[in-house]
Amino acid sequence: MMDEQGLDGMQILPGSQDSFSELWASVQTPSIATIAEEFDDHLGNLLQNGFDMNLFELPPEMVAKDSVTPPSSTVPVVTDYPGEYGFQLRFQKSGTAKSVTSTFSELLKKLYCQLAKTSPVEVLLSKEPPQGAVLRATAVYKKTEHVADVVRRCPHHQTEDTAEHRSHLIRLEGSQRALYFEDPHTKRQSVTVPYEPPQLGSETTAILLSFMCNSSCMGGMNRRQILTILTLETPDGLVLGRRCFEVRVCACPGRDRKTDEESSTKTPNGPKQTKKRKQAPSNSAPHTTTVMKSKSSSSAEEEDKEVFTVLVKGRERYEIIKKINEAFEGAAEKEKAKNKVAVKQELPVPSSGKRLVQRGERSDSD
């Protein structure tokens, strides 16, 4: 049965091929040359009507966000620049008591603060800055021989801290939007916080600075003077204003401020101070003279045998006491020499009943 059906299919195959040929011949297809022209016309209409010519152009705000901030200079500028927005800083007034944790000297333009203690700084502007403006704080060394070095925390304080920015000296407290940066070219570290307009009833905006290392820390500042540069910048890094002030991180800000202010006011009378310091050790001289006098009052034999030791604090006092001792010794030597000369000049005493006749004098018998 299967074979019969297969044979029947083979018998009708030629007929089916004839039918397909007739069908293919009946299909109307354009030539290849006309297809290319029609496609070009259709594509041109599509690009002209529905294609956005600005598809690959980014909006200006996206270009600003993706742009790279130009590298900062090796030697930072430390001069004040209020700019068109009248950028100013104000510090809270505080005295020189030992209990204060932060105090600012208007005379020296210098901030004294304790380690890791917040120091409020008020920012005052004459008009509203551009949208997205930020405040940046950077620490640099004051003296020219150290200005190229990067200000960092000492290794001891870094190991005690677990924060990601533990190497940064300056921190901005009280804001979750503070960002810490390190310049890839100069390796200088800075911290930024968005500028916030003053609250109702106030004309200033306050930020909280804290310094995480003492000025005397070995391996860190190592007693080198530092400056804090506070700048008002656009999101692109363009500086709109700049203010600089010196900072000393110490254990007793009030005491150090008072000492520095007193020394600065006495600077013109510096030579007089040195004279007073040189004369001060003379107060201890009477004690040494009493010792020397007690020695001179004793017999000559005891003076030669006994040795006294006087403990002196300070090189200047030692030199003064040494000169006094040398003067006494010189006087003693002169006294001894004078006594020897006097003994030699003494005339021999004649025996009893006789009188010594001087040269050129006649005796009674003559």
Swiss-Prot record:
Residue numbers binding Zn(2+): 154, 157, 213, 217
Motif Bipartite nuclear localization signal, residue numbers: 275-295
Renumbered residue ranges of the record's region Oligomerization: 305-336
UniProt xrefs under Pfam families: P53, P53_tetramer
Span(s) of short sequence motif Nuclear export signal: 319-330
Cofactor note: Binds 1 zinc ion per subunit.
Biased segments, Basic and acidic residues type: 255-264
Gene Ontology annotations of biological process type: apoptotic process; DNA damage response; positive regulation of transcription by RNA polymerase II; protein tetramerization
Region (Disordered): 255-305, 332-366
Record remark: domains: The N-terminal and C-terminal disordered regions undergo liquid-liquid phase separation (LLPS) following homotetramerization and activation. Post-translational modifications, such as phosphorylation or lactylation affect the ability to undergo LLPS.
Family affiliation: Belongs to the p53 family.
Name of the molecule in the record: Cellular tumor antigen p53
Primary gene name: tp53
